[in-house]
Amino acid sequence: MIGFVIIMQKKIIIDTDPGQDDAVAILLALASPNELNVLGITTVAGNVPLNLTSKNARIICELAGRSELKVFAGSDSPMFRPLITAEHVHGKTGLDGPILPEPKMSLQDKNGIDFLIETLESHEPGSITLCCLGPLTNIAIAIEKAPEIITRAKEIVMMAGAYFEVGNITPAAEFNVFVDPEAAKIILNSSVKKTFLPLDVTHKLLVTKAQIEAFESFGTRVGQVISEMLQFSERFDKQKYGSDAAPLHDPSVIAYLLKPSLFSGRFVNVEIETESLLTLGMTVADWWGVSGREANANFIGDVDIEGFFNLLTERLASL
């Protein structure tokens, strides 16, 4: 008797601020068409300003041979605060390292926030997962403009926050949350299912020299670009942490959707600090259940490191 495994394709929207690690995450999603149906990509200001994140998303789509995908520019600033960027990590373009051509794809005329609202409204409730790789501004503004859409999303899976690993942009805060803490708070206060892939996980996903060599061994343009991008962005974290390897953040979101068994965590209460000057953007995760506050998010705390990199390498080699 021959058995068949039925793979249910997940509809996703990628909300992103590319960023080298965002680029790898997008490539991982595009290398997994049997499991993931990318309905569109919305960009947000974060690692670099909006004009560059919108350009970079199109560059990556073309690199993957997926120029039919639609990229929509969202918010160019946080909801209530001036924009903080991370060119010191990602370079002036956000994708520093390799020499990349100008994209031929056109940026869509429709605003990314309107695309989010209209797409969620037009699809069956509970059928779309929002994959957030950057500051959460676009999603929060969409919720503010059309509160009913949040009941239509299946889940928000986000690379955001930290608890045991504290912060990477300040002593207390992870970058994506720190850039727009009010946006993160709006999402936490919503009824949608939420999963955090925090620094507690991504700081375990260290790109070693051997992993860089594995990307190069593909013998493809994609493999070479990934190698050159990560070697550029890694230099900052290697110096900061005194390590010979650096964390790979955003691909954890896509890997979680592809193979959730690689990850483990707890359903706990998570709150975002929005008032303190000292701890602004801090992700307060009640890991030990001592606050008495109601649990509101799935907070991932551990990952099968070997399994993650095996999945990443296998999929990216197909591009």
Where are these regions (language model features)?
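Short, Lys/Arg-enriched N-terminal segments with co-localized hydrophobic residues
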Residues: 1-7
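Conformational coupling and interaction surfaces
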Residues: 8-9, 28-31, 35-38, 178, ...
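Active-site histidine-anchored catalytic micro-motif
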Residues: 9-16, 20-59, 93, 100-203, ...
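Metal-dependent C-N hydrolase catalytic cores
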Residues: 10, 52-123, 295-303, 313-317
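Generic secondary-structure signature for well-ordered alpha-helical cores
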Residues: 34, 62-67, 76, 121-122, ...
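Acidic/polar N-terminal loop/beta-strand segments that form early-domain functional surfaces
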Residues: 43-46, 74-76, 275
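Short, mixed-charge aromatic SLiMs
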Residues: 48-52, 56, 80, 162-166, ...
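A residue-level signal for conserved active-site and pocket-lining positions in enzyme catalytic cores
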Residues: 71, 187, 254
